[in-house]
Swiss-Prot record:
One Pfam family from the record: WD40
Keywords, alphabetical: Cell cycle, Cell division, Coiled coil, Cytoplasm, Cytoskeleton, Microtubule, Mitosis, Repeat, Transport, WD repeat
InterPro entries named among the record's database cross-references: Dynein_regulator_LIS1, G-protein_beta_WD-40_rep, LIS1_N, LisH, PAC1-like_LisH-like_dom, WD40/YVTN_repeat-like_dom_sf, WD40_repeat_CS, WD40_repeat_dom_sf
Gene3D superfamilies to which the protein is assigned, alphabetical: 1.20.960.30, YVTN repeat-like/Quinoprotein amine dehydrogenase
Record's function text: Positively regulates the activity of the minus-end directed microtubule motor protein dynein. May enhance dynein-mediated microtubule sliding by targeting dynein to the microtubule plus end. Required for nuclear migration during vegetative growth as well as development. Required for retrograde early endosome (EE) transport from the hyphal tip. Required for localization of dynein to the mitotic spindle poles. Recruits additional proteins to the dynein complex at SPBs.
Family indicated by similarity: Belongs to the WD repeat LIS1/nudF family.
Positions of WD repeats: 104-145, 147-187, 191-236, 239-278, 283-342, 344-383, 388-450
PANTHER family assigned to the protein according to its UniProt record, in alphabetical order: TRANSCRIPTION INITIATION FACTOR TFIID, TRANSCRIPTION INITIATION FACTOR TFIID SUBUNIT 5
Molecular functions (GO terms): dynein complex binding
Protein name in the entry: Nuclear distribution protein PAC1-1
CDD domains the UniProt entry points to: WD40
Positions of region (Disordered): 71-93
Domain of life: Eukaryota
């Protein structure tokens, strides 16, 4: 054991063992261990031992959870094409009841995000905490404290092979947490002058990228791009006239879509030194709360809606979706033309996500529902989950697809080779390389996180 652990780690293990034995009334065994290692009552008294109670059990259950996650990832990696086809992931849609209802937050849930590899889900809340769940088991793993006001958004991503969790808050800060080190807060990024409403890791590929870049949106009317390895703000994007609500990077990391209280959405080319809006989307009649960039799998269906005979094949951003307080969803092309208005929600549209298979767009709303819009039927609403939550549905995320190439799976986009829940494919890569996971998470003012899964 001494060869595997440092002297400090061995000492901590011995203390945890003594605390465990003492708390389970195995006093003679605890005394024998004390004598064997020379740890007397004068050095490690009962009061100090109390601090170590439960530590051994916690470490043990963490190892068990990790083993389950490794097995789960291995099973996904080894799944055959036939088994995937039988589950028909391209056509899968969530249905009620949810597989799990996750309860622990004491205030409304504002955001959720999936780990790109493991079955971990992060949720943020007005209770100022982030909670990490095992979405497969439906269990709470830990509670992260650090923000002093509402946690407004969370996202997984970061440098290759080193997944981080980013969070942002009404306390004006962005925080970076290390999942591999018990979610230790490794950096705090100050700089915004008002609440930071959204945060996303930018996929590697953009100049100076390599997965180190993060974009944030704020009530101070700006977007900022950060280098997470240094903590420095490398670019500030100005153009919106009001609060910037949401942000979505393109799969190649070159473009960023933002939404605002100024009733507009803007598409930015962040690969240039001084980014300016490439396209401004004008049409909503109220605050634009959410956005999503369509995956290439959606291009044929959206091109048909737009009246284009041949779907585009080159650009990373050809079609987009935005949701608003005007209760509508708008579909746009890259030129800023609204190609379709989706009407059906009875209240604010809070969240959007494209189905990784490309056929559907899913939305979450303050009308307590989730809606599924079929892009092969010109955006017709083909499914409504009317009992999704008992209050406003504030966020929605799709689990990232499993990418066979681990170097891509741990890429800098924060979603296992995805952006906004849609599969990221390298040039020349086929759809088979990204295995769709039929898992969806939502969060609500009813204090619940819900997991919808196949």
């Amino acid at each position: 054991m001494a060869q595997l652990l440092t002297s400090r780690q061995a000492e901590e293990l011995h203390r945890a063992l003594i605390a465990y034995l003492s708390s389970n009334n195995l006093t003679s065994t605890a005394a024998a261990l004390r004598a064997e290692i020379g740890l007397g009552e004068d050095v490690f008294d009962a009061t100090t031992a109390k601090k170590y109670e439960g530590l051994l059990e916690k470490k043990w259950t963490s190892v068990v959870r990790l083993q389950k996650k490794v097995r789960h990832t291995s099973q996904l990696s080894n799944a055959t094409p036939t088994s995937r086809q039988n589950k028909d992931p391209v056509n899968w849609l969530p249905k009620s009841p949810a597989r799990h209802t996750l309860q622990s937050h004491r205030q409304p849930i504002t955001c959720v995000a999936f780990h790109p590899v493991f079955s971990s889900l992060a949720s943020g809340s007005e209770d100022q905490t982030i909670k990490i769940w095992d979405w497969e088991l439906g269990e709470l793993e830990r509670t992260i404290k650090g923000h002093t006001k509402t946690v407004l958004d969370v996202d997984f991503g970061g440098p290759r092979g080193n997944t981080l969790l980013a969070s942002c808050s009404s306390d004006l800060t962005i925080k970076l947490w290390d999942p591999s080190d018990d979610y230790k807060n490794i950096r705090t990024l100050p700089g915004h002058d008002h609440s930071v409403s959204a945060v996303r890791f930018i996929p590697s590929g953009v100049a100076g990228g390599a997965g180190n870049l993060l974009v944030s949106a704020s009530r101070d009317k700006t977007l900022r791009i950060w280098d997470v390895s240094t903590g420095y703000c490398v670019k500030t994007l100005r153009g919106h006239a009001e609060w910037v609500r949401d942000v979505c990077p393109s799969v190649d990391g070159r473009f960023i879509l933002s939404t605002s209280d100024d009733y507009t959405s803007r598409l930015w080319d962040v690969s240039i030194a001084n980014p300016e809006p490439k396209t401004t989307l004008i049409g909503h009649e109220h605050v634009v709360l959410c956005c999503a960039i369509a995956p290439s799998a959606s291009y044929p269906h959206l091109a048909a809606i737009a009246g284009v005979k041949k779907p585009p094949t080159t650009s990373a951003v050809e079609f987009m979706a935005t949701g608003s307080r005007d209760k509508t969803i708008r579909l746009w092309d890259a030129r800023g033309t609204c190609i379709k208005i989706l009407v059906g929600h009875d209240n604010w549209v809070r969240g959007l996500v494209f189905h990784p298979g490309g056929k559907y767009l899913l939305s979450a709303s303050d009308d307590y529902t989730l809606r599924c819009w079929d892009l092969t039927q010109e955006g017709r609403c083909v499914k409504t989950i009317s009992d999704a939550h008992a209050h406003f549905v504030q966020c929605i995320r799709w689990a990232p697809s499993v990418v066979k190439d681990v170097s891509v799976a741990n890429g800098g986009d924060g979603q296992g080779g995805e952006a906004n829940g849609t599969p990221r494919q390298a040039a020349g890569a086929g759809a088979a390389e990204a295995q769709i996971r039929c898992v969806l998470a939502t969060g609500s003012v009813d204090l619940n996180v819900r997991i919808f899964a196949n």
